[in-house]
Design a protein with these regions (language model features):
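Conserved hydrophobic/aromatic pocket- or pore-lining residues that grip, position, or stack substrates
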Residues: 5, 47, 174
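Short, conserved micro-motifs enriched in small and acidic residues
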Residues: 13-25, 40, 110-116
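Acidic/histidine-rich catalytic neighborhood of metal-dependent amide-processing enzymes
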Residues: 20-90, 94
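Conserved Rossmann-like nucleotide-binding pocket used by diverse enzymes
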Residues: 13, 76, 147
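Short secondary-structure boundary/capping segments
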Residues: 3-5, 37-39, 66, 86-88, ...
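Short beta->alpha junction loops/turns
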Residues: 17, 52-53, 112, 180
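Metal-dependent amide/peptide-bond hydrolase catalytic core
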Residues: 80, 87, 94-222
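Acidic/His- and Gly-rich active-site-bordering loop/insert found
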Residues: 1-15, 36-41
Length: 222
């Protein structure tokens, strides 16, 4: 039972022990030892136990707005990472793309605007970006990537899919992982070019929503 932690051979085994209660414990214990040894520091150390790391990161977003974070100059993140010291982290952007056509019966497809074909074209062009992004590979992080995680036609609001009904609206969510060599603005420029070409061919309304973005981070090796 992962939700019932046990101690075995001097180790705690259970859900969340490694990621990331052990990191939090190490940080607290290090602060305890520094205080106990009476080492004089040229500043303050703050231990921040923050929530929602897997989601919208509301914990750290709130923390950086507080007076505690005002004068911070650096941070150590105690993520386990297979016991390796990490000096780079990929950035991420989640983007929702909605194609707005008009639904029609399968027997009369030309009376509506089918969003599935332009959606397929978007996916094809985005796949080509992954090859292009190899030139932005990082020594430690590998290659940036564009990954469709949700593809829906019709969209959630568009109703239940049916064999004989042509979808009007379609929806796509992308998970974009960025290295320090490329930023979101670079990706957005490529996406805008793709959308422009599709609009010229299909004359369909396309909305782009940036759900969340976090920049890549790089620390000098020295």
């Amino acid at each position: 039972d992962p939700f019932n932690p046990v101690i075995k051979d001097g180790r705690i085994i259970g859900r969340g022990v490694n990621d990331m209660k052990s990191g939090l414990l190490c940080a607290l214990y290090a602060m305890h030892l520094i205080r106990k040894s009476n080492i004089k520091l040229n500043g303050n150390i703050i231990c921040a136990a923050l929530c929602d790391e897997e989601g919208a990161m509301i914990g750290v977003k709130d923390f950086v707005q507080t007076s505690f974070a005002k004068n911070l100059t650096s941070a150590i993140v105690c993520e386990p990472e297979e016991n390796r010291i990490c000096i780079e982290q990929k950035g991420v952007a989640w983007v929702k793309i909605k194609l707005i056509g008009s639904m029609s019966h399968g027997a009369m497809p030309y009376s509506g605007i089918n969003s599935s074909f332009p959606m397929g074209m978007i996916l094809t062009e985005l796949e080509k970006l992954n090859d292009k992004y190899k030139e932005f590979s990082s020594k430690y992080l590998g290659t940036p990537s564009v990954t469709p995680t949700i593809v829906q036609s019709p969209s959630i609001e568009g109703g239940v899919p049916q064999n004989n009904v042509m979808p009007g609206d379609s929806e796509l969510v992308l998970d974009i992982r960025l290295t320090p060599e490329i930023d979101y603005a670079n990706f957005k420029k490529s996406l805008d070019a793709i959308i422009s070409n599709i609009n010229a061919k299909y004359k369909i309304k396309i909305d782009i929503e940036l759900i969340e973005t976090r920049p890549p981070v790089k620390v000098d090796e020295n």
